[in-house]
């Protein structure tokens, strides 16, 4: 009894536990079974008594009482009458809460189509009945009749008849000869008459036989819908409603405002319309009204139900009183303000405060300063409880009074409450997980929150008025998670790249940098000191300076961990820094015996963390911060205008460049170069001049300056060099020259800004520089929104990527090598494999095993691999992981934020998305490089960086008369090999490059290897002979273009005006011998060089040609016309897998190139495969584009026919998954590297994995799949596995190609419909899911947040696993018990039963 009473008051009964959610179409019976009664009247409440009207939209009889345990007429009040139905008003006496749960229904007088299935594209109704959507609408909205049963007449089934045609047919053929209906009834009849299993069979037959692509598409689309209905056991006629459900009244409330007016949910208006029209239709039908009136009423009913479900989807939007469109049920779910994103994913949190932040340099790393007033408010409940426990207040009211009066004992209790109770601090926008961290509060006076300076980088906070929010974790579990997982001391490394994120910046760096400088000839040089106190004494006495080279005794630890004292060479400043290092055998004072810039300090913290652990690191960081601030303050570094030193060399350099530019102008005037080439050369000259001036400036700034008889380091140089503030680029603009600027369109303006800010800009220069500045401001505003949207899409696509097992056992992996740009190593192999797991044994050059497979690469293993001189390593990768749901720990490798192998349950998908999205705001929005000041400096030559021997591979070269070598192939590789046979440097010379070294030459570093014209692509003759022009005739294919500025003419190949005569013209140059026969090339084809449109001829008809002579050249437009989509748009383009505008054409097979005929503005290029029995492949190339290959060239699979950015889909289809992953990783990394943002490759790999989850069926075999269907790779593998296991004869497996989906598409096609619906296109996703009867197994994070559970990652994953085990154990026990009972009942001797356990699964 007592339990019952307790249950009665405990309104939060345990929620039913469930494993999955299914969505399907509701049948009319189902809708009626949910309902508690039919709503017959459109009235809501009585406006006098405020009581709901009977049978109306708020009827208490149907939906339940408005007050707890009280019927409407007031006959039964109190809980004792619970469950009684009042005989007077018919209301059940129960909780008013049931008004949120009970549904009603409206019985429609005529069936209506559900607008989601009708208008959500592709329309499911029209697909099933096999009529165009327009026709279906004409039938539904009573414009045409549709023939359902033609009988013996000449009418076709599903033929549309207008009113007149229908009447006419009835007159002609008799009324009963055929059946034709109109409206939703007609469509319902057609859907009802469908026999789905037979239809599916027929469609499968037709699919097998169909030859045309269009039909195949149509059949497979229809078959998909039919299959969905068969699978989900739904009947197609349920898409036509005969009953409309009414949602509970408390979910569409009516609220009285003051002044006798009411605020109501729009849904009530929409329901009212439906009921009004429905009742009117019923009345008209009873009155036997004329057909036309009834039809109009039915159409209006259809429209009102449409508006209720999705207002504005079809026809006019229904508006309310103030011309505002009414919010329909669909609008309640859609968009940022919809149910999903507003209430289910974005909940507000209780117990929080926010205030401005100020710096707290005296805090420890794990502390934050919390204003007393704020703490008092936040911790109120705890204070009340403590006051009560101490007997200082008997009731809550008394406690409240005490707190309000702020009595002294209240403050004491607040101190107790706060001790060891962490709080969460959050700064918006929270772009990555470090945007929320836990701290222990320290009570402070004042009203601002104090923040530790070192965590600013993680929060991206500064103290110019930023605000932060404080949240209080209430439950014990929450406090535990805060302390163990979210404490700022546990987040030392950044999850994006594994480097420390608690790195000092600005003043601290400047102080440490100043401390660590050393100079010759300072006062007190060579002195010896015993300890720190002695040094400080000497410094105070002025006997020694911070930068003097001295020797001192250092108390360290030897290799066995015993304390030892030794003398070290140092400076007083560096000794201070060494003194705060943790004492450990792995770390000595040598670590800080260098100039401490930001990078160096980051490295030191990293080392300390790895070798001495977390606690030592935190203590070290705090000490370092204190030391840095103190010394920066003491040093008193400041700068004035004289610190900006303009280099003497500037005038000389600028004058020299001016001469060079006027020289180019002269060449242009003489017609030696084209306008584009001149532009390129000028821009090039100025950008190298700017760099030289900058170098000269840095050199002069780095020198000591003598001021007031003392040598001083330049303060600005110190700030920039240490990384405290400013950069070389900014210094260049202050004291060098500002350099080239860009127009808003992205082109570079030829005239640079020669002045710097110290000299001041001229009016014209200032005007030129405003472009960049203005564009920068406009960009910043757009950037934030774009970057946020990219992050959202990334999180959405990767949210269900969780570490679910320890090892999937795969042997696959991807190859990794160092990233090179030209001859420079940008990212070493060492850095790239750190924290990965090796996939196959690594052997050294001598074949000895260096590292076995499945080794986890930590710093030591990486160093080992580095010494073994291997240049590529195969590592496990998320891309090749074979775990079913999620990724395994071995394939993922190191958890970057902890520096150890990743734990199970880590949400690596979200971490990847945040790591890529968080720096998004730092990327540019530009389609060109760096801000206003443009940088071009196109390489035009290459020098050797190492000593070694030159080696040519795939050499295709000709030697000219002057003994220079010209490259005439596209696959040639030039390498420099050292004495051990290791390749130290390699590059692919472009076609037309001049090589300065021969195969086998010995070279020294700095030797010029090659040079080329970066601004023109030449065509070079490989043989000697005479030039003969083919189809090159003045006026049709060649035009003399006279330059207005110079009067010099050049002959340019133009596109002939297309007429039948000129259609087959192929402008080309042939090399012929003395007898007039074409000379043969080495590969046996005649020496004919086809010219593309825009080529400038360099020879005349009949000229004598030597090998290596340039026949023509194509200017490659302004500084790189290849649209450099940079920054954010490029990252988005890559992740969305969009085809670039002028994408490269990739050869799909090895073969010989043949030029085909020309079409209007395309040219046909064919590759004839070398493989036997393969069909030649044709490509259509735009005419004006320069082709990378000549007629007759041999091309390998994956090489480019036409240059440009390749389309990722092409890479996937020709070169496979690994090549695609490498391409995407490299391209994304290029964008981030340009901004100096380090991101680990594995994050990009996780996202790419999510983009590659689907396959496209190429042949269904004997599975249920349809050709052309997109399905999950996992489902595909399972289906094939089933066929393999069935072992039936001649059963074929399905085949498929991997499919690359952009992140938006991939999110919308995830297995979880709840997650997809909450992302975008809510209605479409739900419609699709309902038809398929989809089941959401709640695997991802989003789905679980939406249904209100713990997420299956981190601690939530552990609890989930625990519950699962418990439930399985319970089931076994129950089964055991049941078996024992059964045995007992049979009369066999009774077995002792296991004691009943409590159901632990709940």
UniProtKB/Swiss-Prot annotation:
Residues the record lists as binding Zn(2+) 2: 808, 881, 888, 891
Superkingdom in the source lineage: Bacteria
Keyword Protein biosynthesis recorded: no
Q: Which Pfam families match?
A: RNA_pol_Rpb1_1, RNA_pol_Rpb1_2, RNA_pol_Rpb1_3, RNA_pol_Rpb1_4, RNA_pol_Rpb1_5
The task this protein performs is described as: DNA-dependent RNA polymerase catalyzes the transcription of DNA into RNA using the four ribonucleoside triphosphates as substrates.
**How is the subunit organization of this protein annotated in UniProt?**
The RNAP catalytic core consists of 2 alpha, 1 beta, 1 beta' and 1 omega subunit. When a sigma factor is associated with the core the holoenzyme is formed, which can initiate transcription.
Question: PANTHER family this protein is in?
Answer: DNA-DIRECTED RNA POLYMERASE, DNA-DIRECTED RNA POLYMERASE SUBUNIT BETA
Q: What is this protein called?
A: DNA-directed RNA polymerase subunit beta'
The organism named in the record is Hyphomonas neptunium (strain ATCC 15444)
Traced from the root, the source organism's taxonomic lineage reads: Bacteria, Pseudomonadati, Pseudomonadota, Alphaproteobacteria, Hyphomonadales
Query: Which gene name belongs to this protein?
Result: rpoC
């Amino acid at each position: 009894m007592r339990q019952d009473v307790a249950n009665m008051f405990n309104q939060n009964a345990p929620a039913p536990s469930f494993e999955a959610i299914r969505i399907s179409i509701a049948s009319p019976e189902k809708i009626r079974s949910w309902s508690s009664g039919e709503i017959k009247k459109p009235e809501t409440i009585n406006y006098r008594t405020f009581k709901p009207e009977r049978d109306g939209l708020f009827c208490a009889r149907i939906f339940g009482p408005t007050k707890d345990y009280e019927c409407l007429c007031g006959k039964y009040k109190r809980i004792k009458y619970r469950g009684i139905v009042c005989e007077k008003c018919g209301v059940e006496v129960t909780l008013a809460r049931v008004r949120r749960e009970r549904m009603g229904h409206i019985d429609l007088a005529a069936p209506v189509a559900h607008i989601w299935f009708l208008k959500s594209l592709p329309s499911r109704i029209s697909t099933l009945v096999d009529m165009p959507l327009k026709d279906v609408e004409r039938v539904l909205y009573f414009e045409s009749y549709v023939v359902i049963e033609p009988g013996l007449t000449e009418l076709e089934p599903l033929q549309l008849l207008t009113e007149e045609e229908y009447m006419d047919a009835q007159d002609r053929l008799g009324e009963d000869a055929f059946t034709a209906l109109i409206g939703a009834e007609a469509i319902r009849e057609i859907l009802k008459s469908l026999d789905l299993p037979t239809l599916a069979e027929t469609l499968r037959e037709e699919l097998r036989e169909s030859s045309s692509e269009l039909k195949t598409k149509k059949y497979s689309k229809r078959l998909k819908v039919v299959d969905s209905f068969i699978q989900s056991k739904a009947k197609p006629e349920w898409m036509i409603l005969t009953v409309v459900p009414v949602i509970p009244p408390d979910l569409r409330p009516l609220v009285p405002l003051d002044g006798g007016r009411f605020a109501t949910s729009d849904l009530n208006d929409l329901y009212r319309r439906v009921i009004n029209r429905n009742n009117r239709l019923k009345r008209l039908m009873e009155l036997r009204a004329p057909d036309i009136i009834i039809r109009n009423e039915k159409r209006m009913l259809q429209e009102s139900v449409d508006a209720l479900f999705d207002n504005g989807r079809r026809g006019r939007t229904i508006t309310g009183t103030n011309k505002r469109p009414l919010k329909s049920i669909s609008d309640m779910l859609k968009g940022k303000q919809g149910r999903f994103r507003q209430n289910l994913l974005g909940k507000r949190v209780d117990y929080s405060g926010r205030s401005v932040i100020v710096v707290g340099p005296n805090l420890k790393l794990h502390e934050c300063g919390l204003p007393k007033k704020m703490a008092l408010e936040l911790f109120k409940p705890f204070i009340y409880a403590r006051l009560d426990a101490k007997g200082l207040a008997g009731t809550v009211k008394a406690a409240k009074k005490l707190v309000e009066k702020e009595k002294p004992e209240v403050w004491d209790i607040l101190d107790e409450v706060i001790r060891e109770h962490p709080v969460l601090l959050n700064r918006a926008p929270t772009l990555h997980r470090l945007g929320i961290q836990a701290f222990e509060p320290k009570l402070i006076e004042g009203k601002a929150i104090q923040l530790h300076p070192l965590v600013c980088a993680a929060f991206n906070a500064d103290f110019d008025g930023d605000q932060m929010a404080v949240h209080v974790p209430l439950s014990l579990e929450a406090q535990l998670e805060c302390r163990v997982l979210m404490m700022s001391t546990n987040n030392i490394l950044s999850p994006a790249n594994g480097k420390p994120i608690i790195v000092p910046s600005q003043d601290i760096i400047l102080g440490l940098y100043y401390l660590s400088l050393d100079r010759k000839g300072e006062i007190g040089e060579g002195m010896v000191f015993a300890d720190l106190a002695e040094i400080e004494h000497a410094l105070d006495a002025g006997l020694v300076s911070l930068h003097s080279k001295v020797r001192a005794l250092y108390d360290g630890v030897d290799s066995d961990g015993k304390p030892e004292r030794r003398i070290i060479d140092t400076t007083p400043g560096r000794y201070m820094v060494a003194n705060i290092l943790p004492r450990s055998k792995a770390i000595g004072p040598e670590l800080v015996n260098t100039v401490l810039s930001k990078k160096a300090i980051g490295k030191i913290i990293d080392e300390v963390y790895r070798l001495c652990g977390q606690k030592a690191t935190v203590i070290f960081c705090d000490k370092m911060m204190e030391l840095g601030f103190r010394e920066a303050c003491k040093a008193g570094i400041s700068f004035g205008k004289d610190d900006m030193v303009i280099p003497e060399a500037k005038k000389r350099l600028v004058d020299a460049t001016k001469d060079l530019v006027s020289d180019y102008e002269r060449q242009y005037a003489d017609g030696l170069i084209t306008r584009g080439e001149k532009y390129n050369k000028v821009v090039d000259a100025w950008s190298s001049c700017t760099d030289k001036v900058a170098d000269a400036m840095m050199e002069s700034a780095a020198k000591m300056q003598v001021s007031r008889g003392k040598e001083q380091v330049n303060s600005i140089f110190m700030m920039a060099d240490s990384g405290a503030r400013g950069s070389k680029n900014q210094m260049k603009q202050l004291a060098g020259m500002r350099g080239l600027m860009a127009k808003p369109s992205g082109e570079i303006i030829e005239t640079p800004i020669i002045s710097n800010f110290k000299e001041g800009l001229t009016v014209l220069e200032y005007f030129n520089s405003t472009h960049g500045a203005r564009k920068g401001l406009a960009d910043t505003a757009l950037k934030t929104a774009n970057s946020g949207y990219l992050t959202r899409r990334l999180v959405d696509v990767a949210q269900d990527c969780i570490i679910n097992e320890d090892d999937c056992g795969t042997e696959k992996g991807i190859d990794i090598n160092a990233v090179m740009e030209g001859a420079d190593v940008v990212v070493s192999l060492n850095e790239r494999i750190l924290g990965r797991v090796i996939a196959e044994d690594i052997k050294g050059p001598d074949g000895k095993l260096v590292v076995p497979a499945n080794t986890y690469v930590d710093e030591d293993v990486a160093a080992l691999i580095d010494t073994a001189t291997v240049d590529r390593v195969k590592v496990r990768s998320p891309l090749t992981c074979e775990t079913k749901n999620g990724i395994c720990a071995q394939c993922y490798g190191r958890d970057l934020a902890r520096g150890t192998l990743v734990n199970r349950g880590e949400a690596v998908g979200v971490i990847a998305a945040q790591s890529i999205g968080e720096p998004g705001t730092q990327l540019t929005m530009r389609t060109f490089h760096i801000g206003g000041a443009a940088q071009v400096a196109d390489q035009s030559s290459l020098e050797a960086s190492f000593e070694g021997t030159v080696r040519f591979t795939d050499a295709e070269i000709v030697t000219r008369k002057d003994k220079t070598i010209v490259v005439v192939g596209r696959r040639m590789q030039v390498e420099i090999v050292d004495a051990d046979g290791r390749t130290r440097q390699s590059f692919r010379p472009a076609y037309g490059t001049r090589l300065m070294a021969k195969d086998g030459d010995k070279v020294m570093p700095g030797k010029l290897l090659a040079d080329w014209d970066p601004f023109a692509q030449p065509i070079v003759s490989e043989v000697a002979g005479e030039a003969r022009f083919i189809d090159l005739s003045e006026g049709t294919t060649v035009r003399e273009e006279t330059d207005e500025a110079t009067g010099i003419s050049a002959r340019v190949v133009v596109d002939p005006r297309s007429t039948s005569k000129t259609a087959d013209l192929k402008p080309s140059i042939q090399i012929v011998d003395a007898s007039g026969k074409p000379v043969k090339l080495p590969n046996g084809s005649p020496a004919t060089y086809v010219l593309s449109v825009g080529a400038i001829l360099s020879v005349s008809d009949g000229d004598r040609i030597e090998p290596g002579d340039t026949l023509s050249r194509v200017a490659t437009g302004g500084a790189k016309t290849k649209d450099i989509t940079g920054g954010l748009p490029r990252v988005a383009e890559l992740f969305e897998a969009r085809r670039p505008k002028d994408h490269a054409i990739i050869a799909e097979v090895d073969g010989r190139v043949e030029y085909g005929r020309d079409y209007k503005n395309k040219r046909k290029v064919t590759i004839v495969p070398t493989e036997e029995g393969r069909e030649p492949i044709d490509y259509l190339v735009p005419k004006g584009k320069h082709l990378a290959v000549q007629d007759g060239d041999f091309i390998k699979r994956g090489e480019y026919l036409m240059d440009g950015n390749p389309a990722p889909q092409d890479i996937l289809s020709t070169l496979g998954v690994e090549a695609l992953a490498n391409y995407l990783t490299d391209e994304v990394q290029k964008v981030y590297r340009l901004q100096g943002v380090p991101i680990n490759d594995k994050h990009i790999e996780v996202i790419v994995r999510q983009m590659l989850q689907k396959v496209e069926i190429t042949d269904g075999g004997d599975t249920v799949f349809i050709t052309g269907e997109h399905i999950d790779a996992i489902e595909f593998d399972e289906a094939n596995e089933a066929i393999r296991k069935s072992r039936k004869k001649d059963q074929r497996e399905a085949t498929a190609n991997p499919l690359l989906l952009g992140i938006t598409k991939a999110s919308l096609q995830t297995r979880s419909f709840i997650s997809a619906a909450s992302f975008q296109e809510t209605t479409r996703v739900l419609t699709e899911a309902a038809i398929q009867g989809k089941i959401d197994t709640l695997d991802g994070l989003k789905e679980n947040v939406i249904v209100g559970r713990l997420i299956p990652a981190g601690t939530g994953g552990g609890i989930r696993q625990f519950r699962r085990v418990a439930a399985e154990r319970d089931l076994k026990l129950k089964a055991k018990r049941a078996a024992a009972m059964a045995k007992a009942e049979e009369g066999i001797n009774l077995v002792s039963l296991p004691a009943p356990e409590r159901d632990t699964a709940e």
